[in-house]
């Protein structure tokens, strides 16, 4: 099969110009399509609920980057960033375009990624499903008008065909599912999965390649700003509390998941929020709950015949989600950018129950923990994970970072130094014992610790260095029991704590070996007990 760029462009143009390709539909128009096509149901909250079928999380083993001459030397190839050759990609790409050409209806959205005008990525999103198009409209940055959208000449195109199933033997994939990113052809090709999060994380992966090439830090974090203009960043993997902790009624939200940090400060990459919805309640998370209204999408929640939503029901997945435009939250920064950060919070959900609830890191420790990215995989964010497992995810988001980790770590270290940023490690996981024995650290206490940190009250507080990890733990924090600040005190069996802690330290050391000599200086100064 012979393919070329001309044919590819012609096919895309043909799809866009089809009479039944619906361009830049309003939320109401998309709602009508979703309901008419039986793609979702209307809930009493006003949001639509859609099912993603058997794929209720990302499929990281089915994600590939096309190995192309101008880009291949920059990508950190391995289990996460898997290569696929250009010819294989193009054959599959054209099969998908031909498949979409035969569909009765398609949905097209044009918008942006990145709220910084200098590095903004112009996007076209072509969807097989109406609810996926509403997802794109909610999650990416929306043009001011349909007229503006018509003038967008995309830097990148998402082609999403969830009902197209690949044949691994013929198409060179690992399963029926595929997420393929080509920097040369400027396309993200998605098929075989209805999980809408693949679109947003695909563009995030693209930005994580493009921004550092311009000496701009890209980050898997949430961000907010206080009344005095003080900015806080929250790093962490899905389920560690980024969205929850940054949705603070006393601080304005910059964004909940993906950001850049350039010479002017911090900017949001997205135009929406993608919050975990399991066990969501108005009492615990009022901002998120109130954002789930007309225009929002719920994924895989259980909806009764009367339209009521049971957020506690996990029969389909633990990874239930809500996708809504950022302006569904009242106190946001417009546009979604702010000054340089004063405080960085690294969030981890420690299933061992030995990491302190909060500790202050020096720059070397910050680099070490950023590269380590320790947390526990929480149920539902990836297929096959049903209970927490300890894991290391470089940069607190390894699945989304195509360049070598030291590229991001070096940028972060330079920025911490340049702007005198305070960095804290916060454990939102377990205390008093490992998962199954101990208990989850109270969200109330975590909020109190985080609030004290970002207010600057912990900057010059009294600290004690714990004997196990060598971390600096605050001696006291207002309205937080002293007994939980040093984790050994929360364990009834101190010897079991020491055994568990030593096991974790060894896991950190073993994990860090993969970085080799490039990061020896960070390991020497930043690792535990240094």
Curated annotation (Swiss-Prot):
Positions contributing to ATP binding: 201, 220, 236-244, 285, 321, 440-441, 446
Q: Where does substrate bind?
A: 58, 195, 201, 321
Instruction: Provide the residue positions that the database annotates as binding Mn(2+).
Output: 201, 220, 257
Q: Name the InterPro entries on file.
A: PEP_carboxykinase_ATP, PEP_carboxykinase_C, PEP_carboxykinase_N, PEPCK_ATP_CS
Where does the record place it?
Cytoplasm
Write out the GO cellular component annotations. Answer: cytosol
GO term, biological process aspect, one: gluconeogenesis
Question: Known catalysed reaction(s)?
Answer: oxaloacetate + ATP = phosphoenolpyruvate + ADP + CO2
Q: What cofactor does this chain's UniProt record say it requires?
A: Mn(2+)
Q: Please, which domain of life does this record's source organism belong to? A: Bacteria
- Tell me which EC number(s) this protein carries: 4.1.1.49
Q: Give the residue spans that cross the bilayer.
A: none
Q: Which SUPFAM superfamilies match?
A: PEP carboxykinase N-terminal domain, PEP carboxykinase-like
| Entry's Gene Ontology molecular function annotations | ATP binding; metal ion binding; phosphoenolpyruvate carboxykinase (ATP) activity
**Record keywords, A-Z:** ATP-binding, Cytoplasm, Decarboxylase, Gluconeogenesis, Lyase, Manganese, Metal-binding, Nucleotide-binding
Q: In which pathway does it act?
A: Carbohydrate biosynthesis; gluconeogenesis
| Entry keyword annotation includes Cytoplasm | yes
Q: Which Pfam families match?
A: PEPCK_ATP
Cofactor binding, per record: Binds 1 Mn(2+) ion per subunit.
Keyword Cytoplasm applies: yes
Family note = Belongs to the phosphoenolpyruvate carboxykinase (ATP) family.
Tell me, what does this protein do in biology? Involved in the gluconeogenesis. Catalyzes the conversion of oxaloacetate (OAA) to phosphoenolpyruvate (PEP) through direct phosphoryl transfer between the nucleoside triphosphate and OAA.
Cite the PANTHER family for this sequence: PHOSPHOENOLPYRUVATE CARBOXYKINASE (ATP) (PTHR30031:SF0), PHOSPHOENOLPYRUVATE CARBOXYKINASE ATP (PTHR30031)
NCBIfam families in alphabetical order: pckA, PRK09344.1-2, PRK09344.1-3
What this protein is called in its record is: Phosphoenolpyruvate carboxykinase (ATP)
The protein's organism comes out as: Staphylococcus aureus (strain MRSA252)
């Amino acid at each position: 099969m012979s393919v070329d760029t001309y044919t590819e462009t012609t096919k895309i143009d043909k799809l866009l110009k089809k009479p039944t390709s619906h361009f830049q539909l309003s939320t109401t128009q998309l709602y009508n399509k979703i309901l008419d096509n039986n793609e979702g149901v209307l809930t009493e909250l006003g949001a639509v609920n859609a099912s993603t079928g058997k794929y209720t999380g990302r499929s990281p083993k089915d994600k590939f980057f096309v190995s192309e001459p101008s880009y291949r030397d920059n990508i950190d190839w391995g289990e996460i960033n898997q290569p696929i050759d250009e010819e294989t990609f193009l054959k599959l790409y054209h099969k998908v375009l031909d498949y979409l050409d035969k569909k009765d209806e398609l949905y097209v959205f044009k918008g942006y990624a990145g709220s910084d005008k200098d590095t903004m990525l112009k996007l076209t999103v072509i969807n097989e499903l109406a609810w996926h198009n509403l997802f794109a409209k909610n999650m990416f940055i929306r043009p001011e008008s349909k007229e503006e959208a018509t003038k967008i000449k995309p830097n990148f195109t998402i082609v999403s065909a969830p009902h197209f199933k690949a044949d691994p033997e013929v198409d060179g994939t690992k399963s029926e599912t595929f997420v393929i990113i080509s920097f040369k052809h400027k396309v993200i090709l998605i098929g075989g999965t209805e999980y809408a999060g693949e679109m947003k994380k695909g563009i995030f992966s693209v930005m994580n390649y493009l921004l550092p090439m311009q000496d701009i830090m890209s980050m898997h974090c949430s961000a907010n700003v206080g009344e005095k203009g003080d900015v806080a960043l929250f790093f962490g993997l899905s389920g560690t509390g980024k969205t929850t902790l940054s949705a603070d009624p006393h601080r304005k939200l910059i964004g909940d998941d993906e950001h850049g940090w350039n010479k002017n400060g911090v900017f949001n990459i997205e135009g929406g929020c993608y919050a975990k919805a399991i066990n969501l309640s108005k009492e615990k998370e009022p901002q998120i709950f109130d954002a789930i209204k007309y225009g929002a999408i719920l994924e895989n929640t259980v909806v009764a015949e009367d339209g009521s939503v049971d957020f506690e029901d996990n029969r389909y997945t633990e990874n239930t989600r809500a996708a809504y435009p950022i302006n569904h939250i009242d106190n946001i920064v417009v546009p979604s950018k702010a000054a340089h950060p004063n405080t960085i919070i690294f969030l981890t959900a420690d299933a061992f129950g030995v990491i302190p609830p909060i500790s202050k890191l020096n720059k070397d420790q910050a680099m070490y923990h950023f590269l380590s990215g320790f947390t526990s995989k929480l149920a539902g964010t990836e297929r096959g994970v049903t209970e927490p497992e300890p894991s290391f995810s470089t940069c607190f988001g390894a699945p989304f970072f195509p360049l070598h980790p030291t590229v991001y770590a070096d940028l972060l270290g330079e920025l911490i130094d340049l702007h005198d940023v305070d960095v804290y490690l916060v454990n939102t996981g377990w205390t008093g014992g490992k998962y199954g024995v101990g208990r989850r650290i109270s969200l109330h206490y975590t909020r109190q610790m985080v609030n004290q940190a970002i207010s600057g009250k912990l900057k010059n507080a009294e600290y004690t260095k714990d004997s196990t990890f060598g971390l600096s733990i605050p001696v006291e924090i207002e309205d937080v029991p002293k007994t939980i600040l040093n984790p050994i005190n929360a364990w009834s069996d101190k010897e079991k704590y020491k055994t568990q802690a030593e096991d974790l330290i060894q896991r950190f050391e073993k994990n860090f070996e993969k970085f080799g000599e490039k990061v020896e200086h960070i390991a020497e100064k930043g690792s535990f007990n240094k």
